[in-house]
Amino acid sequence: MRRKGLRLTPNRAEGTARTWSKYYDKLADHFLTRIRVKPSTVILEAGCGKGQLTIPMIQKLPKSVKLIAVDSSIGPYLGWLDELESKIHRSGLESRVHLLRSDVRRIKGVKDSSADIVVSNELLCDLPRKDQLAKALNEFYRILRPGGSMIHGEWSSSPVDHGVGFKVKHSPAWNPDQLFNYTKRAGFHNFRVSYFTETVDFGYNTAIAELRTWGVTESFFKHYERSLKRYGVQLPYEHVIQCEK
């Protein structure tokens, strides 16, 4: 049975940028309905990238809410923090969003118990080793105030519909069961899991363009060309974990 959820399909007229904007706008809604935000809330976004989630999230919150956006902006993400800075200036959000270039395993310049909420999306998959994950979770715990919460989203390892079309099968470093154990070790409690059921379907041309931005090799295109032409690409859902300090 097909699971219910919005399916966004980019077309040549609007391009993938518009589709991704819709996707992250709805993902921000999913996150914000699951966290308690007060007028004085301080949010730290770990691994903010180029602000795909940062911008729609802060725009939906009261103007008194502050957000610290943290990213190392190195390797495949080089320059992304600079791109986010430009977006913040264009959106007039300079007074509400503070950018911090730092490794999330040791966040410099953020005091103990200074944030109410830690948010991240597609971050923990970039920390595939146990020691890397433990350092990041311990750092999030350090930064959060007592009673504060952490929420993290990541693509599920399961495609939306089995047996129909060509799917992206994501292999996350950590599934919800594993994250339950590691967050508990870090001191977190009240662990919960939800699912963000929106997805994106890419036709052949938009799929090729999108996959190139992910650094997909030419050998991949050659091997899967027939499937891509016939089915395009469909992204998996996200599992969203949250817990409290």
Question: Can you say where each PLM-predicted feature lies in the sequence?
Answer:
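Conserved alpha-helix/loop element of class I SAM-dependent methyltransferases that forms part
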Residues: K22-P39, P56
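Conserved Class I S-adenosyl-L-methionine
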Residues: V193-E244
